[in-house]
UniProtKB/Swiss-Prot annotation:
A motif (YXXXXLphi motif) lies at residues 54-60. This is Eukaryotic translation initiation factor 4E-binding protein 2. GO terms for molecular function: eukaryotic initiation factor 4E binding; translation repressor activity. GO terms for cellular component: cytoplasm; intracellular membraneless organelle; neuronal ribonucleoprotein granule; nucleus; postsynapse. The keyword Nucleus applies. The modification Deamidated asparagine is found at residues 99, 102. The modification Phosphoserine is found at residues 65, 83. Changing residue 37 to D/E: Acidic residues do not mimic phosphorylation state. Does not induce folding of the intrinsically disordered protein.
Length: 120
């Protein structure tokens, strides 16, 4: 049997991927899950597999929206991060704890205890 490159197979024609631009007027229309490409482009996919790519101008416009300036709901209480004013008090307590630990470490001679145990 011999085969040749021209045995009835035609090379497929290349086609452009169909795209369309949809203007979104409300941030609530954005999906909840995003993905990124190695180049940093943000995109999302629909349940049907359609990829939605967000351009830079659109995302920069949304950065200054009132919704972007509002913290998310149901945020945990993290002192100094989500609740202001407690960072100074907590940092003083933390510094005192570090000083106590350093004083405790100085009481032991260097090399008394093994850093970790290893079974051979």
């Amino acid at each position: 049997m011999s085969s040749s490159a021209g045995s009835g197979h035609q090379p497929s024609q290349s086609r452009a991927i169909p795209t369309r631009t949809v203007a979104i007027s409300d941030a609530a229309q954005l999906p909840h899950d995003y993905c990124t490409t190695p180049g940093g482009t943000l995109f999302s996919t629909t349940p049907g597999g359609t990829r939605i790519i967000y351009d830079r101008k659109f995302l920069l416009d949304r950065r200054n929206s009132p919704m972007a300036q509002t913290p998310p709901c149901h945020l945990p209480n993290i002192p100094g991060v989500t609740s202001p004013g407690t960072l100074i008090e907590d940092s003083k307590v933390e510094v005192n704890n570090l000083n106590n630990l350093n004083n405790h470490d100085r009481k032991h001679a260097v090399g008394d205890d093994a850093q970790f145990e290893m079974d051979i």
